[in-house]
Amino acid sequence: MALRELKVCLLGDTGVGKSSIVWRFVEDSFDPNINPTIGASFMTKTVQYQNELHKFLIWDTAGQERFRALAPMYYRGSAAAIIVYDITKEETFSTLKNWVKELRQHGPPNIVVAIAGNKCDLIDVREVMERDAKDYADSIHAIFVETSAKNAININELFIEISRRIPSTDANLPSGGKGFKLRRQPSEPKRSCC
């Protein structure tokens, strides 16, 4: 079975639950007292998708303003980006559009974009309507899903949909789909002055 390594970065404001989504996906656990990410953290998980193994190389970036300038370093070369907002905080959805703009300017041209409205278990204090977020995601051709890292809602489904949307690669190429052939150039006849 072929193994593909897929770099995925999580972007979004601080406190939206990026780290909790990663922990739920990788470790199937939830820590309500998880500390904010400083800079970025890295985790991996391999899952089977159709006839391939997809090894997700997950970069969880810090959402604090002081670390925002580092984000392009993490999403360069990414196969996918998950931009997370908190459904209970309208301002996190508003700034999500800035994350998308920055990603479109500095990220790979064919990056798969997913928008995750996290904390969908808190519907009683919802500020962002699901329809508004879905319409925005559709307008930029992004995956859209509402998630709850706390209750394990749509976390695995999010990564399955990313696997589905990432273009397949030629089986003869190394993982990541990037490859080239070396060809020997005919050598010029040797000349001598003597």
Curated annotation (Swiss-Prot):
Q: Which InterPro entries match?
A: P-loop_NTPase, Small_GTP-bd, Small_GTPase
Give the family this protein belongs to, as stated in its UniProt record.
Answer: Belongs to the small GTPase superfamily. Rab family.
- Single Gene Ontology MF annotation: GTPase activity
**What Gene Ontology cellular component terms go with this record?**
actin cytoskeleton; early endosome; endomembrane system; endosome membrane; extracellular exosome; Golgi apparatus; intracellular membrane-bounded organelle; late endosome
Q: Where is this region: Disordered?
A: 174-194
Q: What is the effect of changing residue 64 to L?
A: Constitutive GTPase activity. Impairs normal protein trafficking through early endosomes
- SUPFAM superfamilies per the record? P-loop containing nucleoside triphosphate hydrolases
Species, as recorded: Homo sapiens
Coiled-coil region(s) at which residues? none
Report keywords, A-Z.
Answer: Cell membrane, Cell projection, Cytoplasmic vesicle, Endocytosis, Endosome, GTP-binding, Lipoprotein, Membrane, Nucleotide-binding, Prenylation, Protein transport, Transport
Q: From which residue to which does the signal peptide run? A: none
Lipid sites, type S-geranylgeranyl cysteine: 193-194
On assembly, the entry states: Interacts directly with ZFYVE20. Binds EEA1. Interacts (in its GTP-bound form) with RABGEF1. Interacts (in its GTP-bound form) with RINL.
**Name the record gives this protein:** Ras-related protein Rab-22A
